[in-house]
Amino acid sequence: AEVINSLTATKKQELLQELFGSDANSISISYLRISIGASDLNASVFSYNDLPNGQVDLSQTSFSLAPDMTNLIPLLREILVINPNIKIMAVPWSAPSWMKTNYTTVGSSLSPIFYNSYAQYFVKYIQAMKTQGITIDAICPQNEPLHDGNNPSMLMTAANQISFIKKLGPAFQ
């Protein structure tokens, strides 16, 4: 989003039309995959609930889309004007560091004591994006769940995913 937003207005519109438009000169992308919080492609690492070391926010009261309000969210809105039927999948690269066993965004895993809170993080994300006019059509519990070497990243084995999903599903009810 940051790179696309750095283009001139004309070049940006040309690119967005070429990618998401429906005319003969467009490739008509119909499905996007975006990160929940930062990915390894972002200029800086962030979650939507960053806290100082030692603090926790079980109910996600400090949750905020602020890190993406400058680039990603405005860009998604522009894409939706071009293609209002586009489907969006959202996937995290890491839980907020305070939820992880090593308290950092690199590697490690989600601490089981925070499964319920992390499920609420997903719910808050879907709700917050909806208030921005962006519908998230699908989610995944973790990007590259067995690769924990990027910044951000998080190991989430199949067994961990099963345990977490058992909390995630009911959180959406």
Protein language model features and the residues they cover:
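N-terminal catalytic cores of secreted or lumenal carbohydrate-active enzymes
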Residues: A1-I136, I162, K166
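Alpha/beta-hydrolase-fold catalytic nucleophile elbow
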Residues: V91, Q142-N143
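Active-site-proximal beta-alpha loop/turn segments in soluble metabolic enzymes
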Residues: K100-S111, N143-M156
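Gly/Pro-rich turn-and-neighbor structural signature
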Residues: N150-Q173
